[in-house]
Amino acid sequence: MPVTELSIEDVIRRVGEIGIIPVVRAASVEEANRAVEAICAGGIPIVEITMTVPNAISVIRELVQRRGADVLIGAGTVTNAEQAESCVRAGAQFLVSPGLTASVLSVARVHDRLVIPGALTPTELMNAQELGARVVKIFPCGSMGGPKYIKSLKAPFPHAQLIPTGGVNAGNAAEFIAAGAYALGVGADLVDAAALREGNLGKITSAAKVLVQAVASARPAKSDKKTN
């Protein structure tokens, strides 16, 4: 199935519309593929395959070829330029990093790919913006107070598009969105390692559906949104 080339603006918009980036960490290629199918079945057409997954580049390449037309496939835990280049060549439509590395942003810029660097403090957020980051991952957000921390960051940075990651779950997802999060990065609370290992994909699909509902509940109905 042909993959539609998306602009950075398209990817940013889709991330915001979906509101959730599932972070897939798996012990094998097979587990990663099963996780993606379970997540998509739950109504979340976007995944972040981390570099900690065995043969992550091959997983990304295969997913892009098989599901890239209807699922946004990204690469996570990208920490250096070499990884970034490999992910782009594999077809990753966005890159996510746990921290801020200028070389990763540079590779993404050359290839016209969205990169979502990690930051935690206001200074790190400002540095990311200065380097051209349009969307920033706030990690590990849970250790800083969760939704309250996002609300605090949005006060001096009202236009920042923030994706809290770490400590995000169905119980606080709506609160994060209400606090001003652009989207949410969700890992173990969605992709349950035991369920994946045991083949209990229904648990992951159900968790995805609950997250989708939680995010939707915190957003105004489409009919209430003002058109620009």
Feature-to-residue mapping (PLM):
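Conserved N-terminal beta1-alpha1 strand-loop-helix module at the mouth
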Residues: 1-91, 110, 159, 170-171, ...
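Conserved functional loop/turn residues at catalytic and ligand-binding sites
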Residues: 43, 67, 91, 99, ...
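Catalytic cores of alpha/beta
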Residues: 35, 80-90, 123-131, 168-184
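Hydrophobic faces of well-ordered beta-strands that scaffold small-molecule active sites
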Residues: 20-24, 47-49, 73-76, 95-96, ...
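Glycine-rich phosphate-binding active-site loops on the catalytic face of alpha/beta enzymes
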Residues: 97-104, 137-146, 180-203
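Short, ordered loop/turn segments at secondary-structure junctions
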Residues: 51-52, 78, 100-102, 120-121, ...
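Histidine/lysine/aspartate-rich catalytic loop segments that bind and position anionic ligands
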Residues: 94, 98-144
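Long, low-complexity, intrinsically disordered segments
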Residues: 224-228
